[in-house]
Amino acid sequence: MTVPHFLTLFDLPADEIRQLVRRAIDLKALQRQGKIYEPLKNQVLGMLFEKSSTRTRVSFEVGMIQLGGNAVFLSPRDTQLGRGEPLEDTARVLSRMVDCLMVRTFSHSMLEHFSAYSQVPVINALTDSYHPCQLLADIQTYFEHRGDIQGRTVAWIGDGNNMCQSYINAACQFDFQLHIATPAGYGPDPAILQMARERVQIIAEPREAVRGADLVVTDVWTSMGQEKEKHRRLQDLADYQVNGELMSLAKRDALFMHCLPAHRGEEVSAEVIDGPQSVVWDEAENRLHAQKALLEKLLIGGPL
């Protein structure tokens, strides 16, 4: 039997990933009502971190606990990976001891290699190429505030990084238009763009990209592992800050999202991220609920 992994948004059919978002909304409501729902009793999630994170660790760990299961945190110092054990051996061993594996790492090809040797589902909790769990939370947040995102326009401003590339995938899976504004040399992977030609436009000027948008999204200009490039990146991306002037060109009821952590005064101004159009705190919380829906789907096939 094929093991169901979740490495990109394309690992689930469009109708199932849409159902997953709606299920996340239902699970959030259950929790708010104080109802106990523990379908994952006696199941264990192994959490393998090469890149540190606040939101990823807490949301997955709390999510498993709320669903009745448990989670085990593993950093490179906690495994033999840090001492040269082959990746495939680690995958084989861990997948005999836990029911699901969540991996947050740098190389997407490494994650693909790891998952090929795992006997249990592997979840991409972030690679340098994609961040699909965050997109589940983002789409859930849009659904909650504005309804279905199908047919809407999303503007991505800034670095064409893993979040941008996951938005490209989301444009295909959720059927919306995506405008991407990045400086020269900072665009997303052309091969990823090629898959979504009908739904994605590259627009050099940020003002044109956000004009009429329903949702404006950005991310940090310097990702983990790029610290040596920070000074150059700040200069190159200086004209791509999401501020009040830029947001005024989007629709009057447009939302602003950022996966956090944010750097006020760099990729976004304080007036925007702390303003009335910002839904970043709901977006952050929804990592918990979206990932609970994902764990339920991968481990038991859906709601009991």
UniProtKB/Swiss-Prot annotation:
InterPro entries: Asp/Orn_carbamoyltranf_P-bd (IPR006132), Asp/Orn_carbamoylTrfase (IPR006130), Asp/Orn_carbamoylTrfase_sf (IPR036901), Asp_carbamoyltransf_Asp/Orn-bd (IPR006131), Orn/put_carbamltrans (IPR002292), OTCase_ArgI (IPR024904). Carbamoyl phosphate binds at residues 53-56, 80, 104, 131-134, 259-260, 287. Its EC number is 2.1.3.3. SUPFAM superfamilies: Aspartate/ornithine carbamoyltransferase. GO terms for cellular component: cytoplasm. PROSITE patterns: CARBAMOYLTRANSFERASE. GO terms for biological process: arginine biosynthetic process via ornithine; citrulline biosynthetic process; L-arginine biosynthetic process. The keyword Transferase applies. Its main location: cytoplasm. GO terms for molecular function: amino acid binding; ornithine carbamoyltransferase activity. L-ornithine binds at residues 162, 219, 223-224. It catalyses: carbamoyl phosphate + L-ornithine = L-citrulline + phosphate + H(+). It is found in: Cytoplasm. It holds the Pfam family OTCace_N. Keywords: Amino-acid biosynthesis, Arginine biosynthesis, Cytoplasm, Transferase. Pathway: Amino-acid biosynthesis; L-arginine biosynthesis; L-arginine from L-ornithine and carbamoyl phosphate: step 1/3. HAMAP family: OTCase (MF_01109). Reversibly catalyzes the transfer of the carbamoyl group from carbamoyl phosphate (CP) to the N(epsilon) atom of ornithine (ORN) to produce L-citrulline. Belongs to the aspartate/ornithine carbamoyltransferase superfamily. OTCase family. This is Ornithine carbamoyltransferase. It comes from Nitrosococcus oceani (strain ATCC 19707 / BCRC 17464 / JCM 30415 / NCIMB 11848 / C-107).
